Amino acid sequence: MKKCLLISLVAILILNAASFSQTNMSDQKYKWPENVKPPVAEKKPKEFTAHGDTRVDNYYWMNDYFKKGADSAKVVSYLTAENNYYKAMMASTEAFQEKLYNEMRARIKEKDESVPYFKNGYYYYTRQVEGKDYYIYARKKGTLTASEEILLDVNQMAEGFNYFSATGFSISPNNKLLAYGTDSKSRRQYVIRVKNLETGEILKDSITNTEGQAVWANDNKTLFYTAKNPVTLLSEKIKKHTLGNAESADVVVYEEKDPTNYIGVGNTKSEKYILIVSQATLSSELRYVSADSPDQPFVVFQPRMKEVLYDIDHADNQFYIRTNKDAKNFKLMTTPENATSVENWKEFIRHDDKVLIQGFDVFKNFLAINERKDGLTQVHIINTKTNESHFLAFDEPSYAAGVGYNPEFDTDVIRFNYTSLTTPASIYDYDMSKKTKKLLKQQDVLGGFNVKDYVTERLYATAADGTKIPMSVVYKKGFKKDGKGPVMLYGYGSYGASMDASFSSTRLSLLDRGFAFVIAHIRGGQEMGRYWYEDGKMFKKKNTFTDFITAAEYLIKNNFTSPKHLYASGGSAGGLLMGAVVNMRPDLWNGIVAQVPFVDVINTMSDASIPLTTNEYDEWGNPANKESYYYMKSYSPYDNVEKKNYPHMLITTGLHDSQVQYFEPAKWVAKLREMKSGNNVLLLHTDMEVGHGGASGRFKVLKDRAREYAFILALENITQ
């Protein structure tokens, strides 16, 4: 049920206001096919009783493909029937979808290269070549004028697969070996392999069912990795692998007994220590061992404390600790290497009710801290020798900035990232001593993109409880605030994930056709601090939905749009948001796009065999608890579908989704078809090859966006 941003592509058409005027949009409605009948799902009532309450689920049989039950084939037949209905209904938009795809792709600089970073004697970078979907990973020794050494060509690795993902690239300390993970099923169950970079040989070592990331010890032969439960997909063991040994000989160095915790393995920036983290929503615990002594047992850094989160890094013979102990928005502390328990922690940066500390990076003479204030990110630089501090300056009303990947310790230069709704992704080097910055690369947007053609705003809507809800807005000059403008409102609002204002070249295909795009920074995210998250989870979850509705009402009241021209989109937990708001206020929207939506809250959170369920009890609640059960039931989209008119809806899923299983959106659509009145279009598209993240290639994902945009644009009678 969790969360990445794909920065995409570019237009061959420059569309003028006369071609897609807001007046024309409101004059006519798109004519959908009338003689195509939607599938009618079979009803097989199944009763669930808890806390004296009985729910009847007529479509629970759709779980059978996941459960490998008797109705597995029938599930596939139903999904296929829905796909056929989708195809028939969208047939007249296929040429338009292709046009959208082509213009999105035309914005991409297909032959491109990342900014190199320097680590342990080599410059590392990625390349993309024209016409190919995936990255080539490469390096050069010592200088950028040296000959190129290709580490992995993912395009070659992906040949023959409908889906392919490579992740977790990790170079051994002696620079001779590369560990990496691959997934060809889209279930996020990675196989770790090791490549000899001197000979090009792929070693016989093959480690299955992992998170994909391996951490090297300093002996260049010992790897630590996270092993998954094959059914629930929970990360449940940290194992140690010695090169040359069979996977069956791997040693469990940590086993997580509490299924509500996530676990993972990493190392400190100094690479002196290997770390194991065990973290739930509300608390964490870390263990560490010297990277020089991988056979020694891991030592607990500080035993878990109730409702206390902490994470650490290491530099100059001490640990830095970010923690929310007595500090809701987190603070920074330090402790000696040989005294890591909490009584030895000393405050380095005090807590601030108005500033959320999101993360930090350590250098020989400086600390760089990712912070958030008033809903916007900021980069705070502290000289650890003089205690002098300053902030990087950013001028736009809405933006996203943060410290990038900085593997070097002994340097005064930090790399940071910057983007906004109108500024393509940009990478800078900043000299923390001289306070000067240098732009290294900005995402190329082809096809005549001009930042001066677009306008951004930062707006605030007032919720019923008086809370100010920030919104980031972008539109092309010429957008009229006359109540007739089409607006796409986007939201997420879960897990404390902040939806910052970032650039998307695909989005230009909406903006250039007269749309405004709005991000509602609703509670459940962390845009305004930790309390913003806590006010949008568990028994305050409904704030997420009412905040989004408040944002929509603001846009209507202030003449950005009207219900005839207002659209909403969200995916995963944002799909839950879509399901909740169409139940609560179906009258506000002309159309909805819900991607891989988490909508069957009670059933999913009651079934511990479903991946990730137990990890998320502190996010949604555990239905075994009576109070949680009834609160979750009061907003669960699937449980609250009613006999009423719903807006036009496009719902997408992937058959192999490991985060939100396919059956949630499938059941939801079946129930909506049964209950809804009116003639508004309801479509379900299931990708039979992929999972939660959608298509794996940089071009394939554009097909998904083109499909969604064609649906929304057709509702505005825009088909060119």
Predicted regions and their residues:
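Positively charged n-region of N-terminal signal peptides that target proteins for export
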Residues: 1-4
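Beta-propeller folds
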Residues: 7-8, 12, 16-17, 21-413, ...
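Short hydrophobic segments within beta-strands
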Residues: 126, 322, 370, 417, ...
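Conserved beta-strand segments of alpha/beta enzyme cores
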Residues: 150, 252, 436, 516, ...
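Cap/lid segment of the alpha/beta-hydrolase catalytic domain
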Residues: 155-169, 180-187, 198-203, 430-436, ...
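Residue-level signal for short, function-critical loop segments
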Residues: 325, 366, 494, 572, ...
